């Protein structure tokens, strides 16, 4: 595990409390690490993966003392690792450690591979992410029902589940004055996942308000609560933090209060390789999993009711493929006998990030982060007619090219997705780009195109799940619109940094700096982006939840089509990208799916 680092910052009684280390509770010693302790046993439910959705669903199921659950997690309990995980200001320091899966993509643009960051440990990626807490546009979630046929997956329903997960703290007067916003009707207060303002106790930088004043002059809404269903605009954001500014990862929220339940067992240091099935008249029924660490050391464990895959958007598709569920062409190449033909591992949608950074003058000193969710017109500016023309003339061509590249399998069904995205951007005023600004002596924008038209894939390369041989191929920028959008968002960030009220605090650009001329065209920005982007690590849709006709892998209750007793319950199932950070969606989704599982359990009792 990462070594523990403890530090205490003493502030006056009047100051907001900065990060204080959390109480250290030895959870790991109460968990299982010996696979023989569970091998051959039978549980009601087996959950493959102890990340955000896995731990949330495990906690909800085991509220019923009659339900026995086993969670199998490759990593360990890491929430005690001190500031490197607990302190939100240490974001990024955990990258490259044993708590980071650090998957490699196949060679992409210019033959570059990219690292895909994902948490390895109980809590999954909530251990290592930026713990930002926003929600998407309501029309995006409504489309899951209206466009993709997933009954019950609409904003009104999901909004209640998302609020049910949350325990929000109202910002202080000083935080509101600095640029935070809070609409109490959009927040839950009785949930498990704490949210509040990030605050290190230092004075607030005036740059947040300067950004708001700059975009307000352009007609952009400011100080919007980003959790109310229409996030377009500029505001400061909430984070998953407790009152001591400690990261509230999924293990701290859902496992720490519940790890001593007698009906909940957590096995660490092991990975699920494949699902075990028996054939029935109704098709294959999941009866357990094979887990272990290598081909010579692995075990079987059995599920009375269901197997629930929660290994994440990069890994859950692989478990299905190792189990014989997937595209025949992929399984044949890996020497796996096909059990069921489903479009597993395609339709994967991740975003891309670039950075525009400048020095801040001494007048801009202080802490703070603000986000600009920009719509289509705000992002593209003078280039909006060109971008609109692409959306109105190229969807058929893009769908054909994507299918030919292996990003999807059906041109007609993919065009439904593309038309949905076009409607969002041109008719529904959804946020198209996110510009995330950090201060503290700088004006730093990390920014990304939120709505990618590129479709990637992740597939196995052998029949042995423990060799860890797979091809993660996001296919970044193989769609021209995605590159244009990322370039336009980058250009917008540079323009905003030195105009309007922001000019007072601008003290010279450091990135791109001299690497890109100041009056760069969108074409020049595109060239720069290709050389300097990174993945955004928000991949979804590799086991899409949509009608089977449109390319779905799971139905509206997260059940894998054509099977019994098998669900995928993680970030691989949302059928679309969204204009937000994804934790709120995943928590709400996990609670909704948990209710569906419990409904089926009640019917079987």
UniProtKB/Swiss-Prot annotation:
Pfam families referenced in this protein's UniProt entry, alphabetically: GMC_oxred_C, GMC_oxred_N
Activity regulation text: Activity is completely inhibited by p-chloromercuribenzoate and partially by aldehyde reagent such as dimedon, phenylhydrazine, N(2)H(4), NaHS0(3) and NH(2)OH.
Residue pairs linked by disulfide bridges in the UniProt entry: 186-228
Localization, UniProt: Secreted; Secreted, Cell wall; Cytoplasm; Secreted, Extracellular space, Extracellular matrix
Reactions this protein catalyses: beta-D-glucose + O2 = D-glucono-1,5-lactone + H2O2
Summary of the protein's practical applications: The high specificity, high turnover and high stability of glucose oxidase make it an ideal enzyme for biosensor applications and such as the detection and quantitation of glucose in industrial solutions and body fluids. Glucose oxidase is used in the food industry for removal of residual glucose, e.g., desugaring of dried egg products, and as an antioxidant in the production of beer and soft drinks.
Signal peptide feature range: 1-18
EC number: 1.1.3.4
Listed name of the protein: Glucose oxidase
Native source species: Penicillium amagasakiense
């Amino acid at each position: 595990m990462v070594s523990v680092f403890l530090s205490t910052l003493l502030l006056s009684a009047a100051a907001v409390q900065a990060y204080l280390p959390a109480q250290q509770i030895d959870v790991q010693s109460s968990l299982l690490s010996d696979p023989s302790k569970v091998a051959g046993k039978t549980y009601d439910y087996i959950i493959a993966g102890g990340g955000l959705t896995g731990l949330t669903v495990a906690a909800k199921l085991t509220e019923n003392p009659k339900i026995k659950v086993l969670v199998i997690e490759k990593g360990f309990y890491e929430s005690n690792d001190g500031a490197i995980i607990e302190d939100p200001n240490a974001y990024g320091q955990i990258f490259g450690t044993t708590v980071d899966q650090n998957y490699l993509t196949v060679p992409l643009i210019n033959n570059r591979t990219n690292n895909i960051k994902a948490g390895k440990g109980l809590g999954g990626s909530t251990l290592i992410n930026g713990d930002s807490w926003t929600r998407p546009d309501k029309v995006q979630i409504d489309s899951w029902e209206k466009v993709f046929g997933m009954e019950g997956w609409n904003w009104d329903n999901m909004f209640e589940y998302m609020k049910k997960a949350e325990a929000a703290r109202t910002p202080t007067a000083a935080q509101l004055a600095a640029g935070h916003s809070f609409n109490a009707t959009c927040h839950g207060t009785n949930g498990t996942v704490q949210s509040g303002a990030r605050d290190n106790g230092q004075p607030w930088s005036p740059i947040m308000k300067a950004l708001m004043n700059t975009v307000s002059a352009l007609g952009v809404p400011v100080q919007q609560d980003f959790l109310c269903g229409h996030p377009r605009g500029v505001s400061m954001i909430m984070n998953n933090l407790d009152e001591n500014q400690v990261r509230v990862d999924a293990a701290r929220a859902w496992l720490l209060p519940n790890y001593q339940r007698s009906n909940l067992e957590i096995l660490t240091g092991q990975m699920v390789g494949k699902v075990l099935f028996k054939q029935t008249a109704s098709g294959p029924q999941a009866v357990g999993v094979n887990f272990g660490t290598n081909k010579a050391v692995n075990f079987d464990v059995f599920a009375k009711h269901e197997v629930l895959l929660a290994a994440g958007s990069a890994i859950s598709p692989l478990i299905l493929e190792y189990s014989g569920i997937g595209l025949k062409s992929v399984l044949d190449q890996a020497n796996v006998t096909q059990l069921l033909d489903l479009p597993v591992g395609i339709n994967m949608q991740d975003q891309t990030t670039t950075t525009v950074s400048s020095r801040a003058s001494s007048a801009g000193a202080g802490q703070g982060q603000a986000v600009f969710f920009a719509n289509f017109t705000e992002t593209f500016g003078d280039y909006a007619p060109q971008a609109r023309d692409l959306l109105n003339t190229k969807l058929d061509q893009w769908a054909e090219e994507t299918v030919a590249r292996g990003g999807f399998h059906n041109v007609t069904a993919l065009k439904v997705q593309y038309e949905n995205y076009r409607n969002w951007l041109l008719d529904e005023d959804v946020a198209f780009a996110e510009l995330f600004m950090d201060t503290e002596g700088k004006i730093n924008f990390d920014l990304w195109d939120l709505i990618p038209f590129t479709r990637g894939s992740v597939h196995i390369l052998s029949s042995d799940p423990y060799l860890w041989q797979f091809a993660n191929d996001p296919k970044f920028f193989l769609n021209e619109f995605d590159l244009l959008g990322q370039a336009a968002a980058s250009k917008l960030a540079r323009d905003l940094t030195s105009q309007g009220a922001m000019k007072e605090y601008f003290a010279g650009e450091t990135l791109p700096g001299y690497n890109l001329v100041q009056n760069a065209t969108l074409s020049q920005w595109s060239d720069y982006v290709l050389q300097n982007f990174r993945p955004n690590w928000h991949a979804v849709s590799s086991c899409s939840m949509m009608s089977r006709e449109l390319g779905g892998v799971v139905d509206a209750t997260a059940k894998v089509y054509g099977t019994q007793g098998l669900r995928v319950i993680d970030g691989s199932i949302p059928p679309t990208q969204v204009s937000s950070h994804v934790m709120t969606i995943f928590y709400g989704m996990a609670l909704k799916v948990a209710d569906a599982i419990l409904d089926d359990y009640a019917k079987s009792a």
